[in-house]
Regions:
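Accessory nucleic acid-recognition modules appended to NTPase machines
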Residues: 75-214
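Conserved beta-strand scaffold positions in the cores of enzyme catalytic domains, especially
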Residues: 11-15, 225, 244-246
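Conserved small/polar residues in nucleotide/adenosyl-binding loops
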Residues: 266-272
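Conserved catalytic cores of phosphodiester-cleaving nucleases, focusing on short active-site segments
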Residues: 200, 204, 218-234
């Protein structure tokens, strides 16, 4: 947020991600799964899958992780987990964003309204004019609020490959920051396809440059194309593309350029950017 530049003169600022699936398994199943690079996963995913599936029922744990595995405090009071998430969200929107962004506190209801609209539809391509009209704010205010929600780790605002980056630039696709937020904030039925995409984007964004692909779902590090889907996801959208992969849910093992979703980011590499 705006306060980061002032604080950075006096302290080192870290952005701490919630549990990766690897960390979740290590914590809950007392495993010691190592960190690997994305390249290692792409080159050796079958051998890695075999080694892990022999140790743990990954698909059951992965389903649980998507619902309540991102924030470590789930194990303290499982029945109150979503209530605690909502309390944290309210704290960020009602206190932290106004203080750190200089937003008038009377506008926090607008920010919260925007967040819940995103929760109902994410991931989606935003129509800035319609969104600003629906909430009753200007275009620039809407873009500033979207930027604040992204910096607060409540949303992920992604641009298409080849796009520039600006605080007042319309995001090409909006996501909630992680799948647990989807289950906590959405009052409607959760679409599993949206959950898969949100998980994939969340796990990559802290360590890799991630963009919306022109041909598929995601374009990573200016090189790799990924299409995310269920176990029967076909390769039509990546045919003819180099360094292109299917990331499929509900499978324990992959083959060739089809990788299990649970494995694709079970080993998160060290960050390559601040």
């Amino acid at each position: 947020l705006n306060a980061k530049s002032d604080l950075s003169r006096r302290a080192i600022v870290y952005e701490m991600q919630g549990f990766s699936f690897r960390e979740y398994l290590n914590w809950n199943e007392k495993l010691s799964l190592p960190i690997l690079t994305l390249n290692n996963i792409l080159d050796n995913h079958l051998a890695l899958s075999v080694g892990i599936v022999d140790k743990v029922k990954v698909l059951k744990h992965f389903s649980d992780y998507l619902k309540h595995g991102y924030y470590p405090y789930y194990n303290e009071l499982p029945a109150l987990y979503y209530s605690r998430i909502n309390e944290v969200v309210n704290l960020i929107v009602e206190l932290e964003i106004p203080q750190l962004r200089g937003v008038d506190i009377s506008y926090t209801t607008k920010i919260k309204q925007l967040l819940y609209i995103i929760a109902e539809s994410a991931p989606f391509i935003p129509n800035v004019s319609k969104l600003s009209e629906r909430i009753g704010i200007s275009r620039n205010s809407l873009l500033a609020y979207l930027d604040a929600l992204h910096d607060s780790c409540l949303t992920m605002n992604l641009q298409k490959e080849g796009s520039g980056i600006s605080r007042l630039q319309k995001p090409d696709k909006l996501f909630l920051e992680n799948p647990n937020l989807m289950y906590a904030l959405s009052a409607s039925q959760i679409d599993i396809g949206n959950v898969r995409e949100t998980f994939f984007a969340n796990q990559l964004r802290y360590c890799h440059k991630i963009n919306v692909s022109k041909e598929s779902d995601f374009f990573i590090d200016g090189r790799y194309t990924f299409e995310v889907g269920g176990r029967h996801k076909g390769k039509q959208q990546i045919n003819g593309l180099s360094d292109a992969y299917i990331v499929a849910d509900d499978i324990e093992y992959g083959i060739n350029n089809k990788i299990p979703l649970w494995l694709s980011l079970i080993h998160i590499s060290e960050p390559t950017r601040p």
